[in-house]
Amino acid sequence: MSTLPVSSASFSSSSLLPVNDKSSKKQDVARNTTTFDASIWGDQFLTYDEKEDFVVEKQLVEELKVEVRKELMIKDYEPTQYGKLIKVVDAIQRLGIAYHFEMEIEEALQHIYTTYGNNWINSKNLESSSLWFRLLRQQGFNVSSEIFKNHMDKQGKFKETLCNDVKGLLALYEAAYMRVEGEHILDEAIEFTKTHLAIVAKDLSCDSLSRTEIQQALKQPLRKRLARLEAVHYIPLYQQQPTHNEVLLKLAKLDFNILQSMHKKELSQIYKWWKDLDLQKNLPYVRDRLVEGYFWILAIYFEPEHSRTRIFLIKTCMWLVVLDDTFDNYGTYEELEIFTQAVQRWSISCLDTLPEYMKLIYKQQVNDHQEMEEALEKEGKAYQIYYAKEMAKKYVRSLLVEAKWLKEGYMPTLEEYMSNAVVTVGQALMIARSYVGRDEMVTEDTFKWVATDPPIVKASCLIFRLMDDITSHEEEQKRNHIPSCVECYIKETGASEEEACEFFSKQVEDAWKVINQESLRPTHVPFPLLMPPINFARICDVLYIDNDGYTHAGAHMINHIKSLLVHPMV
């Protein structure tokens, strides 16, 4: 149903209630269950070394930040040096330290946009114009892709002579992923650069640094990368560049390790909460995937100021895991109906109406929300929990729809399936909750905006749902599960499985175009509030880049987690 952390699993079509459920004494109830492996992490993250206070390092970071701010002072650059300035901005962003300099970066790029509009000073240089285009589009400035006509022939094709400009090709490739619907010049740019970069990547005469960057880009363009993982990837590459800025490099390494320590401490705190619930004993059918869940949340917010929101999000994430496994993997339809009704009422008085094993789920759900509501009430923000609850109610209702389809053996139309499945993926719910407990930028209008299913939220949800279904539909059909979008499409059109997956992969790319369009100014909400739906879409490209990274947490997923939460940057 929804897309939530899993690891490898074994399937059993009819199991019995766990022995700790009192109702099992009355009768044996056949259940459609999946047995999941234990967490591969054990108690590795349960304790945190309090000695890691980084007092000296934090002071050094503050000193280095002063030096970097000088590098970003737009007034200190002649117009002919703006090409150098945008390279500094690009390095800062890719090194993962841009959150320290948001105001300075905005001021610099705003000045460049105001001064030049669509006419970049160095438009004849493919690398420079591509970098200019990408950085301004990322910042929400709607610069025109017509600038790339400078590099096309009379037939409207990119000049073959560009093949000799490897840096320019790579920069154009990355820029083209900022495309919106109807930008055929950027569609053409992706096809052109992909073809030629693939050749370069196999050319042993090309330097290893360039080959590494190209291979990474072809696997995952910058637009779809997560900031923290990009920092892990880029810091060593940047260090190898002969012209690297030593101040930026030193700051990036120090900052990475300070953040990693903070995240480990946070994970240790949430780990204690998770262990106290003792779900392995009380709800043994539930996946134990706290670390994977926290990795997911770090993809949305990694900055220190979002700690409270992160903790609320990880609790939400794990609550969704429990709900997903209960609806997908354990509860009878009658029990799920009762639970759904209780969620709609959202009152602790509903406990007595629930089956014994559901009481822990419901009580914890109510308590976690009440705890956050009480904290927010002191700040005049209790309304945020109202909206969080309403979206949770919608989510649970949609889970029940799928449970009903499964019970009745109903094959939904593709339209029916998708309208419900973009809710059960849980993405919109998580996006809304990413605003809970944030700074004053968030207002009640922010939650009203999310509740209308705006295009950027719809697109983010669609990406998650489609990428999940494409990678996991075969395995899900081996057990008792509702059809995915792939099966629905095949039934309606007579297409092959390969054709169905190609169709939905194209829809994923189209959804990214919507995200890019909705990120251009003027935006419906402040620009920083668009980052959660963008980052939730990006996490899909990490989870599903090779296969279902949650269902089968392979080496790449384990390495990602270790790189962020175990291994320091040296």
Predicted feature locations:
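Terpene synthase/cyclase
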Residues: 1-570
